[in-house]
UniProtKB/Swiss-Prot annotation:
It is an enzyme of class 2 (transferase). Its EC number is 2.7.7.6. This is DNA-directed RNA polymerase subunit beta. InterPro entries: DNA-dir_RNA_pol_bsu_ext_1_sf, DNA-dir_RNA_pol_bsu_external_1, DNA-dir_RNA_pol_su2, DNA-dir_RNAP_su2_dom, DNA-dir_RNAP_su2_hyb_sf, RNA_pol_bsu_bac, RNA_pol_bsu_CS, RNA_pol_Rpb2_2. Keywords: Chloroplast, DNA-directed RNA polymerase, Nucleotidyltransferase, Plastid, Transcription, Transferase. It comes from Phaeodactylum tricornutum (strain CCAP 1055/1). DNA-dependent RNA polymerase catalyzes the transcription of DNA into RNA using the four ribonucleoside triphosphates as substrates. It is found in: Plastid, Chloroplast. GO terms for molecular function: DNA binding; DNA-directed RNA polymerase activity; ribonucleoside binding. The lineage of its organism: Eukaryota, Sar, Stramenopiles, Ochrophyta, Bacillariophyta. Belongs to the RNA polymerase beta chain family. In plastids the minimal PEP RNA polymerase catalytic core is composed of four subunits: alpha, beta, beta', and beta''. When a (nuclear-encoded) sigma factor is associated with the core the holoenzyme is formed, which can initiate transcription. It holds the Pfam family RNA_pol_Rpb2_45. The keyword Transcription applies. GO terms for cellular component: chloroplast; DNA-directed RNA polymerase complex; mitochondrion.
Length: 1389
């Protein structure tokens, strides 16, 4: 295979897929549903799917086509019905489960006599995708955040919602104010006043370890003491503290600033510490009993405190009381700002570090801490606040490089909290957690399983709570999992629900610090080894398991092989590909990946990349269909409760029904487009994004429809419909194929050290692998040894273009037409066309009608032969042999083995699009044929090449305005010489209605008809073959028995007396409809299956029309240059060439520059040269590899050659190449300027004026609105629209407008009266009210608005009264008047 003009089989994708289904896919599904139990679980249906067999179709292909049958085989499976109670087999037999439509050799299915095709579907591949959240707001700066480090003290409540402070501790400076009375500076510590927020932050800088657990524990006790004890004991405790603070002998009214300061500092700190709910959980009775033990243990551990036993007992009593009273304490509001206040940080920290009890040995302290911890653990004692063993962090403040100094003037204006917070932003130093996770982009992961609904995992902010009022609730963004619009919950909830512990989750997550604190903690009771969660998790929540557990269940969610491979590669997992369910590892990996994407700058997944899209071909669609059918069957059998009986096996029809439904009405099962061989071929190579599980065309974005770099060589960038499906329906390129996993591949030649290796098969690459290699395009020149000749080669690498040396190139594309689809590859010189026009060109080739006398194109691309072979519209030889006989109806070939193979030709058959399918033999008797050789030509195929149109002589010049705006002027030669003549075959379906009431039958004896009208019918009343029929002619004569009620009294009497059976009959014949004509070529009659008295059930009559080209038909070139014929000019009036040849077609020259489809000029000039030289050209696109402007050089060269060969110098004018002087046929004078003339390949499109022309005088009306129907099929009228109304209004044609709105449209009464008046020659009466207005009134009444009209009298009348007029019931057009009002004041508005 040279891959230049011989390419892989175009229909292989469909055929391979169906064969896979028959051999593998079917057994897979049958194995999945091998056992089905019924409702009672007593009966079991066992299917032996491995042993299935297919029974040969009852109809052959041709019979199925002709008689509207189905080409399908019965699928037979051995089935057992077992009774599990008595363990017996009730039924064991081969059972035909379904009838499966079979694919023909042309990759189509025959359903009800029509060829249908199952279009491949391109959908998102199963796997996981990460995308950035759209419309993400930047995070709110007022939002309080937890830091990662435990320097924010965290209070333990079972609900986990208390923190000591959200911010780092910071210290406003006090100011001194001069007090004139005491003649002394007075210190006002600002934490007392409301102005606490006015001040900026100073950071402490302290390195040594200066705090332990007991330091703060004592503060806590002191605070409790001051609240709970009597004033005497309170004083004692305070004195105790003052003793620690070296302030023993002083009273409270200190003169010394330092001491005031210190006490205030303590008070403030302790207020803050205690402003939380201390405990929620109630204490056990056991603890109350064991209080004494606790006290004794507590006293033993007093070595650390230099205090007497009494004081220690006091303290522990206080602690005890604290715990007991905690239940009664109301939950206090969190004070979100904790300020440690000091004047000179260094000085006061040293002062604090001198406290006696801090000078004790640290090691002892830790030991005691451990014992204290064990004690609390035993006694289920929950300390109110957790601390890290070293609180060094808390007092360690770093001065940043951008340290901002305190500016008093600026602070004067900070009045509100908001202003302060805004200013505070400048000074705040971010903690590790904030730095890591703050203000980053958020992502969402979407898991798409092969079976089951999509699962979304992503960040979601808890936005329902007002973060300013309730800073506790406004936690960090949580990672949530979402099954649908309603069901969602945090991932941690789900994992804990499934029984995982915090520790397991912590160890499995790479970014566990997002969810858990990662510093050593003093932790209470049983959760000693568990990490502390950052988020509020209600503990009682995990007892019940929700529907989210379903995602781990293969019956609800199945990733499939492809999904598992995709997830493994995306998340770097090493799971076995047999494990096709979602696992915990997947959830962990996805969560990690989400957080990783958040903190690292990475590109999100490109969902439009072809590595993330896969193709589901026929086989897989059918396999899914079987799965659905068997699921329905299982459900049905489970719901059946009646007794066991083999008759229950009838429920297997439900599988059959789902298959019929799919082939009959699915979006992917389409009526094959058989206009011409190309259209049928491209239809079978189409991939659609629509259909079940695909996109919804109304809600789809532009990105999905757009061309993507990964489409290169896989999906055609050109061929796609215009309109709402653009980009959603595409075509495979010429060389693309689908691999086992459903991903598209395209072939490349390997390049090693600058040499193209063209031995053997090319390498097929999928889109994701291709991104890692440097790939050169096909139009790079090579020498005869296949070495790349250029020094710098442009390559595609990671979806970008880079220039490299030949040695760096890894692969090279195999063909220049590898990029485009089959239809686009037929356009010569399409590299010179604008893409939009190339799109129109490739779409219009599919609409071209097969002509009576087709011609091969002079200028082609070399693919015409293969398209003709693969299209399935020709007969190809099955094996090598010798032709023994050829007739118009069959060809007989003798095989080498002596077998006689008979090929039946299709003669004048109707295609799905009413075009004519006709085989003409092109082999002769005695010829040796090879396997795969074409034996016959088909529609639009001449000598085994695709021939969609005609080579005609065209000129680009205006002619009297007849080619204005894409109109086309043609020569009458095209009509008389049948150049653009085509045959169309219409099928008329006549059904014989045989109800019990109306016995309808076909007959030639039709009452009250002229014998001339029935002379063309046979004895059964059916038209004879060969008759030419016109509108109104009878196709099938039918009579229907007259109803007895309509009979005359005499005939009724006769029937009553004699019991006469002979009823009267009336004519009910089927006649040709308006505008239809043609010759009857075949009639097909269908007999009833039951042996009833009457023969026919329905009759098909096939009528062929020969349609010559006429004004209004649409013709087009291959470059998107389409137009409507505006006038057929006699040949003597057409402009002619210097040698006297008149042109065939005149096109408008203005259609070229603005549309930029210059390829048509190259084509027509090369066609002219080919016509003169009697040569044909095969031009592959993208020919610049042979030199610059090579297309132009080739054409000039060939034109010059032709002018020399023919000795006609006018063919090539070196000053205006391609232009010739034309002579006007009417005057004989030359035209002023030379004109471009050439031989172009023009197509006649299926949009024929005969099918569009339509007229109506009277006809059917719509039932509700009573307006004329619309459309040709309903014999409808033309809508008189908004703009037409403007035209009448502009001319003031009021009566015309009124008529249009009433009697010509939907005023029923007026319509009838007008008709009456016209018939009787009377004056036309006044009009009534349009029906649509009445409908409007009814609609208004249905929403409770009563619309009525009132009659108001004249001004001069003295009487005043109102009369209600009902517009709908008692309406009389003549009596209705509107009088002027009697009194202006009576009119109420």
């Amino acid at each position: 295979m040279n891959y230049t003009n011989a390419l892989p089989d175009f229909l292989a994708m469909q055929r391979i897929s169906f064969c896979w289904f028959i051999t593998q896919g079917l057994t897979e599904e049958l194995a999945l549903f091998s056992r089905i139990q019924d409702f009672s679980q007593n009966t079991e249906y066992v299917m032996f799917g491995e042993e299935y067999s297919l029974i040969k179709p009852s109809y052959s292909l041709l019979i199925a086509r002709k008689y509207s049958g189905n080409y399908r085989a019965q699928l037979v499976i051995p089935i057992e019905v077992r009774n599990k109670v008595v363990n017996s087999i009730r039924y064991h037999n081969q059972f035909p489960i379904i009838t499966l439509p079979l694919m023909t050799t042309d990759a189509t299915f025959i359903i009800n006599g029509c060829e249908r095709v199952i279009v491949s579907q391109i959908i998102r591949s199963p796997g996981v995708y990460f995308e950035k959240n759209k419309n993400q707001k930047t995070r709110n700066q007022f939002k309080k955040k937890l830091s990662t480090d435990i320097n924010k003290l965290r209070s333990f409540i079972p609900s986990g919602e208390a923190f000591i402070s959200e911010f780092d501790l910071f210290f406003p400076l006090p100011t001194s104010i001069y007090d004139p009375v005491k003649k002394k500076k007075k210190i006002i510590p600002h934490w007392q006043s409301n102005s606490i927020y006015y001040y900026s932050i100073k950071y402490l800088k302290q390195k040594q370890q200066n705090s332990t657990f007991y330091f703060l524990q004592s503060f806590k006790l002191y605070r409790v003491a001051s609240k709970l004890l009597s004033s005497k004991s309170k004083q004692r405790v305070i004195q105790l503290f003052l003793k620690w603070l070296k302030l023993k002998n002083k009273s409270f009214e200190f003169q010394d600033e330092k001491q005031i300061y210190l006490i205030k500092y303590f008070n403030f700190l302790l207020t803050s510490l205690m402003k939380y709910e201390i405990l929620q959980s109630s204490l056990t009775t056991k603890f109350n009993e064991d209080k004494t033990i606790l006290l004794s243990k507590f006293t033993k551990s007093n070595a650390i405190l230099n205090l007497s036993d009494k004081q220690i007992i006091n303290l522990s009593m206080i602690y005890n009381k604290l715990i007991i009273n905690s239940q009664t304490l109301a939950q206090m509001e969190l004070n979100s700002n904790l300020f440690l206040i000091t004047k000179e940080p260094r000085e006061w920290l040293t002062e604090m570090s001198n406290f006696l009890f801090l000078k004790k040995q640290i090691s002892k302290a830790t030991f005691t801490l451990k014992s204290f911890q064990e004690l609390t653990q035993l006694q289920n004692l929950k300390p109110a606040i957790y601390f890290s063993i070293s609180l060094k962090e808390q007092l360690k403040y770093v001065f940043g490089k951008n340290k901002l100094t305190y500016k008093s003037d600026r602070h004067k204006y900070l009045k509100t909290k908001t202003q302060f917070l805004l200013y505070r932003k400048d000074h705040e130093i971010k903690t590790n957690y904030n730095k890591k996770y703050d203000e980053k982009d958020l992502y969402t992961a979407t898991v798409i399983p092969e079976y089951g609904s999509w699962i979304r995992i992503g960040f979601q902010r808890n936005t329902k709570i007002n973060s300013y009022k309730y800073p506790l609730k406004s936690q960090e963004d949580e990672v949530i999992i979402q099954l649908d619009k309603i069901n969602q919950k945090p991932v941690l909830y789900l994992l804990k629900e499934m029984g995982l512990t915090d520790l397991e989750i912590y160890q499995n997550l790479e970014y566990a610090d997002f969810f858990y604190f990662n510093k050593p903690l003093l932790i209470n009771s049983k959760r000693l080894s568990e990490p502390l969660s950052r988020f509020n998790l209600g503990l009682s929540y995990f007892k019940n398991i929700s529907e989210f557990s379903r995602i781990f269940d293969p019956t609800y969610y199945r990733l499939g092989r492809v999904g598992r491979l995709k997830i493994n590669s995306r998340l770097n997992l090493k799971m076995s590909e047999r494990l096709q369910t979602i696992t915990y590892e997947d959830i962990f990996a996805i969560t990690d990946k989400l957080i990783n994407l958040t903190i690292s700058k990475t590109v999100q997944d490109d969902i439009d990349h072809l590595k993330n899209r896969r193709v589901r071909s026929v086989g897989e669609l059918l396999q899914n269909l079987f799965r659905i059918g068997f699921q329905r069957l299982g459900r049905k059998l489970r719901n059946q409760t009646n007794k066991i009986d083999s008759g229950q096996l009838l429920s297997f029809n439900i599988v059959n029904a789902s298959i019929r439904e799919f082939f009959g009405s699915s979006q992917l099962s389409q009526y094959l487009d058989q206009t011409n061989p190309l259209s049928s071929l491209t239809h079978r190579r189409r991939v659609s994004g629509l259909g079940p599980g695909g996109f919804d065309r109304d809600r789809i974005s532009f990105a999905v429809r757009d061309i993507h770099p990964s489409h290169y060589g896989r999906i055609c960038p050109i061929e796609t419909p215009e309109g709402q499906n653009v980009g959603l329906i595409a075509s495979l390129t010429t060389c693309a194929r689908v691999n086992k996993s459903g991903f598209l591949e395209t072939p490349f030649w390997r390049v090693i050290n600058g040499k193209v290796v063209k031995t053997g098969q090319p390498v097929y690459l999928t889109a994701d692998i291709e991104d890692f290699y440097k790939i050169a395009p096909a139009d790079i020149a090579t020498n005869k040894d296949n070495y790349l000749t250029k020094n710098v080669i442009p390559v595609r690498y990671k979806q970008d273009f880079v220039n490299v040396t030949p040695s760096e190139v890894d692969f090279i594309a195999i063909s220049t037409i590898q990029v485009v689809s089959v239809a686009a590859s037929l356009i010569p010189f399409f590299e010179h066309d604008d893409a939009n026009r190339a799109l129109m060109g490739s779409n219009m080739q599919r609409q071209s009608v097969p002509l009576l006398l087709p011609q091969k194109p002079i200028v082609g691309t070399g693919l015409e032969n293969q398209i003709a072979i693969d299209s399935g519209m020709t007969l190809n030889s099955y094996s090598n042999g010798v032709v023994s006989s050829v007739t118009a109806n069959k060809i007989v070939v003798n095989d080498k083995t002596g077998k006689r193979l008979t090929y039946k030709l299709q003669k004048y058959l109707r295609s799905n699009q009413q075009t004519c399918i006709n085989h003409r033999p092109i082999v002769w008797k005695g010829e040796q044929v090879k396997s795969g050789q074409i034996l016959t030509d088909g529609p639009a195929i001449t000598s085994s090449e695709l021939s969609l149109g005609q080579n005609v002589l065209i000129g680009y010049m205006p002619w009297q305005g007849y080619n204005f705006e894409d109109a086309i002027l043609i020569n009458e030669r095209l009509v008389y010489d049948d150049v653009f003549t085509s045959i169309h075959i219409e099928r008329y379906k006549i059904e014989i209605d045989r109800n019990s009431d109306t016995l309808e039958r076909t007959t030639k004896n039709i009452p009250n008809l002229n014998p001339r009208e029935i002379r063309h019918l046979n004895d059964d009343g059916i038209v004879t073959v060969g008759t030419f029929v016109r509108p109104g002619d009878i196709l099938v004569g039918k009579v229907i028995s007259n109803n007895t009620s309509e009979q005359l009294p005499e005939s009724k009497l006769l029937r009553a007396i004699f019991g006469a059976k002979a009823k009267g009959v009336k004519d009910n014949s089927y006649r040709m409809s308006d505008g239809e004509y043609g010759r009857v070529i075949e009639t097909v009659t269908f007999n009833r299956r039951t042996k009833l008295t009457y023969k026919f059930e329905k009759i098909y009559v096939f009528i062929a029309q020969i349609r010559k080209i006429q004004v209004g038909d649409k013709i087009a070139g291959r470059h998107g240059n389409k137009g409507i014929i505006s006038r057929i000019l006699s040949r003597q009036d057409m402009p002619f060439l210097p040698d006297g040849t008149p042109l065939d077609i005149l096109l408008n020259p203005l259609g070229v520059p603005s549309r930029m489809n210059v390829g048509q000029l190259y084509e027509c000039l090369l066609g002219l040269a080919g016509d003169k030289l009697n040569a044909r050209f095969k031009i592959l696109p993208f020919d610049e590899m042979y030199g610059l402007e090579i297309s132009r050089i080739l054409i000039n060269k060939k034109l010059r050659q032709a002018s020399i060969a023919k000795n006609e110098s006018w063919l090539f004018n070196p000053y205006a190449p391609g232009k010739m002087v034309l002579i006007d046929g009417r005057t004989g004078k030359e035209f002023e300027n030379p004109v471009t003339v050439g031989n172009a390949y023009m197509l006649k499109l299926i949009h024929l004026v005969d099918d569009k022309m339509h007229a109506r005088a009277t006809g059917p009306y719509s039932l509700i609105t009573q307006q004329p129907l619309r459309g040709k099929a309903q014999h409808g009228g033309q809508r008189f629209g908004e703009m037409e109304v403007w035209a009448l209004e502009g001319f003031g044609a009021a009566f015309t407008l009124k008529e249009l709105l009433t009697i010509k449209s939907d005023d029923m009464q007026g319509r009838n009266e007008t008709l009456n008046a016209i018939v009787k020659g009377q004056q036309i009466p006044k009009f009534g009210i349009p029906e649509s207005f009445k409908v409007l009134l009814h609609e208004l009444r249905s929403i409770g608005l009563d619309m009525s009209t009132y009659k108001i009298n004249r001004f001069n009348s003295t009487k005043r009264y109102e009369v209600e007029v009902n517009l709908i019931e008692k309406y009389n057009a003549l009596s209705k008047t509107f009088s002027p009002t009697s009194n202006i004041n009576d009119i109420s508005f």
